[in-house]
Amino acid sequence: MTETDTWHWDQPQIHALFELPLPELLFRAQEVHRRHFNPGQVQACTLVSIKTGACAEDCTYCSQSARYDTGLEREALIDVETVREAAQRARASGATRLCMGAAWRGPKDRDLETLVAMVRAVKAEGLEACLSAGLLAEGQAERLAEAGLDYFNHNLDTSPSYYDQVVTTRSYEQRLQTLERIRDAGMRVCCGGIVGLGEARADRVEMLATLANLPVPPQSVPINRLIPIPGTPLEAAEPVDPFEIVRTIAATRLVLPRSYVRLAAGREQMSDELQALCLSAGANSLFLGERLLTTDNPDADADHRLLHRLGMTLEPRTHSCAELEP
């Protein structure tokens, strides 16, 4: 099989990747990874919550849903100066991108001016700017793009087949429509999913097929490991076999060869050895900082120590800007 930018991946092909002996799968993933990226470098992003809790959505995994008693305190939209200070700390830690997350169904037009100012503040600090703020209405993507927003994050979470077991307050089609609006506005897409929602391997395969066959592949693909939150419907979810996480990372690398594959939420529960295996499988991006919105993350010093032990370095800012254009 020859890898091309226009390759169409069907589900049986992706399933066959998952079924490979792990050494063979890792070999193929690393081979593809080296064609497009420096295997000794990792992109670093920092995630900050700009509006916390009281979300109207019913995502069964989320601590921020107003429908579940998780003990999370609601916080209003923070001010621009707080975002600027977060960007300065992120840059000092080695991050090249600040990702801002807001617990909304979608931004209201009245909040757009504040979001625009936040984007400009991040850009003024020399970082790429990413925003995760739910569904985008018509015209909102264009305003954010004009402000200089590099990325908008909107995950698919899981497969179309399993989706209604996870979320019922927004449809899969609405998510795909938001991705289309992001692309049409000229921004890059950050879109991935979650492993451990109770889905089967077939759902992970279907999700990757959906991502790989979008009109333009997402330039950034976060793969999250579920962190069960007390009070949510998934508080007692069974953990996924760690090797299945590695297989998911490797398959993602193979079907999305030019995308940054981010080892996102759930690293705090991973051993250094498992994280190293995921990096060997093709993950080349992570979040720096001890918090991911409302959950724990390894602190930056621990990540720097791990990368040093692995002989790896953080990717410099100039390389991060050279990602595949939409």
Curated annotation (Swiss-Prot):
Pathway: Cofactor biosynthesis; biotin biosynthesis; biotin from 7,8-diaminononanoate: step 2/2. Its cofactor is [4Fe-4S] cluster; [2Fe-2S] cluster. [4Fe-4S] cluster binds at residues 55, 59, 62. It catalyses: (4R,5S)-dethiobiotin + (sulfur carrier)-SH + 2 reduced [2Fe-2S]-[ferredoxin] + 2 S-adenosyl-L-methionine = (sulfur carrier)-H + biotin + 2 5'-deoxyadenosine + 2 L-methionine + 2 oxidized [2Fe-2S]-[ferredoxin]. Residues 40-264 form the Radical SAM core domain. [2Fe-2S] cluster binds at residues 99, 130, 190, 262. GO terms for molecular function: 2 iron, 2 sulfur cluster binding; 4 iron, 4 sulfur cluster binding; biotin synthase activity; iron ion binding. It comes from the Bacteria. The keyword Metal-binding applies. Pfam families: BATS, Radical_SAM. Binds 1 [4Fe-4S] cluster. The cluster is coordinated with 3 cysteines and an exchangeable S-adenosyl-L-methionine. Binds 1 [2Fe-2S] cluster. The cluster is coordinated with 3 cysteines and 1 arginine. One of its GO terms (biological process) is biotin biosynthetic process. The keyword S-adenosyl-L-methionine applies. Keywords: 2Fe-2S, 4Fe-4S, Biotin biosynthesis, Iron, Iron-sulfur, Metal-binding, S-adenosyl-L-methionine, Transferase. Its EC number is 2.8.1.6. Coiled coil: none annotated. Homodimer. Catalyzes the conversion of dethiobiotin (DTB) to biotin by the insertion of a sulfur atom into dethiobiotin via a radical-based mechanism. Belongs to the radical SAM superfamily. Biotin synthase family. NCBIfam families: bioB. This is Biotin synthase. The gene is bioB.
